[in-house]
Design a protein with these regions (language model features):
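Intrinsically disordered, low-complexity acidic/Ser/Thr/Pro-rich linker and tail segments
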Residues: 2-44, 49-138, 142-144, 149-181
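Structural hallmark of WD40 beta-propellers
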Residues: 52, 143-147, 202-207, 225-228, ...
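Short C-terminal beta-strands that terminate individual repeats in beta-propeller domains
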Residues: 125-129, 167-177, 181-187, 226-231, ...
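Canonical WD40 repeat/beta-propeller blade segments in eukaryotic WD-repeat proteins
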Residues: 131-138, 189-197, 229-242, 275-281, ...
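Conserved strand-to-loop turn within each blade of WD40 beta-propeller repeats
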Residues: 149-152, 209-212, 249-252, 290-293, ...
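WD40-repeat beta-propellers
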Residues: 155-159, 209, 215-219, 255-259, ...
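Solenoidal tandem-repeat scaffolds enriched in leucines and small polar residues
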Residues: 228-309, 313, 318-323, 327-329
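Blade-level signature of beta-propeller repeat domains, shared across WD40, Kelch, NHL, RCC1
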Residues: 410-437
Length: 437
């Protein structure tokens, strides 16, 4: 009996000793074995881009923690004062199609960049290439190529990495002696008014709309040569494209469709407005148009019919200028500084935001020349040289403002961190990330 008790006592002592060893090893505090609440608190102070691309790859536990979509959604809502997305009755929310991780990272990356633009970007002005107002600009191929056109009837193709500032140390806007890769002084017989690519991420062709009643096709792979001229019969004020299908908005209130494989004549025409078609925007299989008659219309390219038209844009003396359509919002910018929110799925008017308040009658209004949406951000540019950056929530929440070195801006484009504007004084103005140098 005593032997049995002694055996049990020894076994208990061994278990106690092993427990003490395990306790000692577990008491070693490492980041990996911290409670999840503490890990999340630490993560809330870190760069979301670092969390996704570095910390989540350290170990399986971190990957599992950061894979929670609700976590990224919480971080998005902690950044804003309103609601995101701007509308809460979207089908993509019901179907869980919104990538909250992408939204959170996009918000953080863009805010850091544009809130400290002097440290993060090179601000460069290019002059003496065009000799009249540069009315339209375009960025393609991840911001590596820029195309410009203007009232000198010419077009230029720029290799963005070649646009280097004269003074690398000066944070003020600097001049560049960069020359375009190709230039066509006689691209059109009238003003070049709008540009569009066949595919913005891997463009091989660019389409130019002009007051000479044509839309021309330019091949980026064969020396910027014109390979087709579409006959519009009236001044072309806007153009969009998807692959081989090209659509042009005309001064005559019509919208024409062309097929690059068919030839120079239109394959379809429709008339959704009672005034000149001022802007077009393509989204999925649809094309939105706005007109001087202050209405919005949407065309279904697949069905070949109007989905909706005569959607009133509530402006007094203003007229619509630009369109931006994303999965979460459809915006129309007008000539008096207001941004009008439309439902991106139903295309009905929701609300107007006064981005630039109407000034006294003796001062000019700020026209919204361009509007750009990314997963979490909104960029709005005025013709008075002010560019505002917002979280794309409701209402839009401004976090940065950048001023151009001019008061006469014609158009703004943004792609992959590169921003360019056209100017009335025949110059182009670039903001290029420092890491590209």
């Amino acid at each position: 009996m005593c032997d049995m008790l002694q055996s049990v006592r020894e076994e208990l002592m061994n278990l106690e000793a092993n427990g003490d060893e395990n306790k000692d090893s577990s008491d070693e505090a490492t980041f990996e074995n911290l409670p999840v609440e503490i890990i999340l608190t630490i993560c809330s102070y870190l760069d979301p881009y670092f969390l996704r691309n570095t910390l989540s790859k350290v170990c399986r536990r971190f990957a599992d923690i950061l894979a929670d979509d609700h976590l990224w959604k919480h971080w998005v809502h902690s950044k804003i004062k309103g609601c995101f997305p701007a509308l809460l009755d979207l089908k993509l929310l019901d179907e869980d199609q919104l990538n909250w991780e992408d939204v959170c990272i996009d918000m953080d990356v863009e805010r850091r960049k544009w809130s400290d633009v002097k440290e993060s970007m090179r601000h460069i002005v290019v002059k003496d290439v065009h000799f009249a107002s540069v009315d339209t600009v375009l960025l393609v191929n991840n911001g590596e190529l820029c195309i410009s056109g203007g009232r000198d009837r010419g077009m230029a193709l720029w290799n963005v990495p070649d646009i280097t500032p004269q003074d690398q140390s000066d944070n003020a806007p600097t001049l560049s002696e960069a020359k375009p890769k190709h230039i066509k002084h006689d691209a059109h017989a009238g003003w070049v008014w709008d540009l569009a690519p066949d595919c913005i991420d891997s463009a091989t062709k660019v389409f130019s709309a002009s007051w000479d009643n044509t839309v021309k096709v330019w091949d980026l792979e064969t020396g910027f040569e014109c390979i087709e001229t579409f006959k519009c019969g009236m001044s072309a004020l806007s153009v969009v494209s998807t692959d081989n299908l090209v659509m042009a908005g005309l001064y005559s209130k019509k919208i024409l469709s062309f097929d690059l494989r068919v030839g120079p004549n239109p394959i379809n025409a429709y008339k959704p407005h009672r005034g000149p078609v001022l802007a077009l925007h393509t989204y999925k299989g649809m094309v939105a148009s706005v007109s001087e008659d202050k209405t919005l219309a949407v065309w279904d390219k697949v069905a070949g019919k109007l989905l909706t038209n005569d959607v009133k844009i509530p402006t007094d003396k203003a007229y619509p200028v630009c369109i931006s359509w994303s999965p979460t919002a459809l915006y129309v910018g007008d000539s008096k500084g207001s941004l009008h929110l439309m439902h991106p799925e139903d295309q009905i008017y929701i609300k107007s935001h006064e981005i630039w308040p109407e000034p006294p009658i003796i001062k000019p209004s700020s026209k919204i020349t361009s509007c750009y949406q990314s997963p979490g951000n909104l960029i709005v540019c005025s013709d008075r040289g002010e560019i505002k950056f917002f979280y794309n929530c409701y209402p839009p929440q401004e976090y940065a403002t950048v001023k151009a070195s001019t008061f006469d801006v014609t158009q703004m484009r943004y792609l992959n961190g590169v921003m360019v504007i056209g100017r009335c004084d025949s110059a182009l103005e670039f903001w290029i990330p420092n890491e590209k140098y």
